């Protein structure tokens, strides 16, 4: 877990550098890492997920960002894909590489100013982040598409935080069906490796009981 904590410090450091260099101006922060750093989600993740919300010359932006990261870190991968800008880099001060993924398509989304912080770092970064309701919308789509148990963990977290569900009956049925397919080892390893011991033990024992209850309420409404 010490490795994951140090990685979190790395994430905050990078966000602070990006903000100070004005790279965050056209972007909004989202995804699991955003939920952890801005809303205290108790699951570790290793990527920074961002979305363009303003029109910029993306080719020029990508070139500038590559140069900036190369000057501060060891840049190991940089690709301008059709849908995303992908950059991966490492630092001798931290044990894991960090990946930044920026969605290129500009879509209407709900966001607000939040403070990204870590209990393991003194730095705090004020930035634009998805609202809980927008995060819920994104997570429902991701869970149905990827069927990744970590997305379902995030969904349960969002429901506990009071995020509006926006889950229709068809989606609720599909999500519930996917949950029944998760094996014991998926809870212990795939999900458990991203959780602290207490939270891991809870989910190995209780699975997604709360989420399933809420999905059933949605189907029966």
Where are these regions (language model features)?
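Structured mid-to-C-terminal alpha-helical surface segments
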Residues: 1-27, 38-40, 53-221
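Glycine-rich beta-strand-to-loop/alpha-helix junction loops that act as flexible
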Residues: 29-33
């Amino acid at each position: 877990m010490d490795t994951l904590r140090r990685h979190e410090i790395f994430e905050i450091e990078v966000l602070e550098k990006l903000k100070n260099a004005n790279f965050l101006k056209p972007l909004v922060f989202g995804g699991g890492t955003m939920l952890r750093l801005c809303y205290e989600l108790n699951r570790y993740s290793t990527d920074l997920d961002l979305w363009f919300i303003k029109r910029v010359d993306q080719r020029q932006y990508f070139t500038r960002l590559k140069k900036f990261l190369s000057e501060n870190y060891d840049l190991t991968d940089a690709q301008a894909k059709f849908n995303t800008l992908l950059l991966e880099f490492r630092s001798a001060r931290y044990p894991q590489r960090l990946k930044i993924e920026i969605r290129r398509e500009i879509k209407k989304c709900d966001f607000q100013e939040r403070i990204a912080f870590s209990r393991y770092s003194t730095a705090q970064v004020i930035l634009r982040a998805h609202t809980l309701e927008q995060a819920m919308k994104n997570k429902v789509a991701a869970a149905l598409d990827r069927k990744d148990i970590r997305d379902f963990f995030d969904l349960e977290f969002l429901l506990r935080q009071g995020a509006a569900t926006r889950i229709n009956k068809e989606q609720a049925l599909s999500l519930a069906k996917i949950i029944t397919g998760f094996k014991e080892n998926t809870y212990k390893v795939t999900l458990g490796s991203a959780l602290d011991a207490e939270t891991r033990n809870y989910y190995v024992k209780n699975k997604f009981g709360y989420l399933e209850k809420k999905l059933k309420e949605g189907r029966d409404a």
